[in-house]
């Protein structure tokens, strides 16, 4: 389900299904922003601070502005809540519209994202 811009409505504690709001950012910057100011979509998961890759750096898969098979790639701000504690977190993704709908399906079906606190608890066997 794709909806329009973010609203400030209060939803009940047990919605019928996950809320997903998708919208592209105003421009397509050359680097992915930290995403607090961008329009967003919401899902029932949470993501922590991006981790740094170790080892040699790899070049980007596509050049900025390149059109992929699913259409032009745009930057989307994603707001999700933790699959364990429900805290909100916002992060950015850059993708085409078809891939974004596949990402939505994955998050709605089989993927629970965890906040750093819950991830640490899961890793150390605390619940």
Curated annotation (Swiss-Prot):
Protein encoded by which gene: E7
Function as written in the Swiss-Prot or TrEMBL entry: Plays a role in viral genome replication by driving entry of quiescent cells into the cell cycle. Stimulation of progression from G1 to S phase allows the virus to efficiently use the cellular DNA replicating machinery to achieve viral genome replication. E7 protein has both transforming and trans-activating activities. Induces the disassembly of the E2F1 transcription factor from RB1, with subsequent transcriptional activation of E2F1-regulated S-phase genes. Interferes with host histone deacetylation mediated by HDAC1 and HDAC2, leading to transcription activation.
Quaternary structure note: Homodimer. Homooligomer. Interacts with host RB1; this interaction induces dissociation of RB1-E2F1 complex thereby disrupting RB1 activity. Interacts with host EP300; this interaction represses EP300 transcriptional activity. Interacts with protein E2; this interaction inhibits E7 oncogenic activity. Interacts with host TMEM173/STING; this interaction impairs the ability of TMEM173/STING to sense cytosolic DNA and promote the production of type I interferon (IFN-alpha and IFN-beta).
Region of interest (E7 terminal domain), residue spans: 2-56
Motif (Nuclear export signal): 100-108
Gene3D superfamilies: 3.30.160.330
Keyword annotations: Activator, DNA-binding, Early protein, G1/S host cell cycle checkpoint dysregulation by virus, Host cytoplasm, Host nucleus, Host-virus interaction, Inhibition of host innate immune response by virus, Inhibition of host interferon signaling pathway by virus, Interferon antiviral system evasion, Metal-binding, Modulation of host cell cycle by virus, Oncogene, Transcription, Transcription regulation, Viral immunoevasion, Zinc, Zinc-finger
Modifications the protein undergoes after translation, according to the UniProt entry: Highly phosphorylated.
Family the entry assigns: Belongs to the papillomaviridae E7 protein family.
Descriptive protein name: Protein E7
Gene Ontology CC terms: host cell cytoplasm; host cell nucleus
UniProt-annotated location(s): Host cytoplasm; Host nucleus
Pfam families: E7 (PF00527)
Keyword Transcription belongs to the record: yes
Membrane-spanning intervals of the chain: none
Record-level GO BP terms: DNA-templated transcription; symbiont-mediated perturbation of host cell cycle G1/S transition checkpoint; symbiont-mediated suppression of host innate immune response; symbiont-mediated suppression of host type I interferon-mediated signaling pathway
Domain remark in the UniProt entry: The E7 terminal domain is an intrinsically disordered domain, whose flexibility and conformational transitions confer target adaptability to the oncoprotein. It allows adaptation to a variety of protein targets and exposes the PEST degradation sequence that regulates its turnover in the cell.
Segments for region (Disordered): 33-66
Superkingdom of source: Viruses
ZnF region ranges: unnamed: 82-118
GO MF assignments: DNA binding; DNA-binding transcription factor activity; protein domain specific binding; zinc ion binding
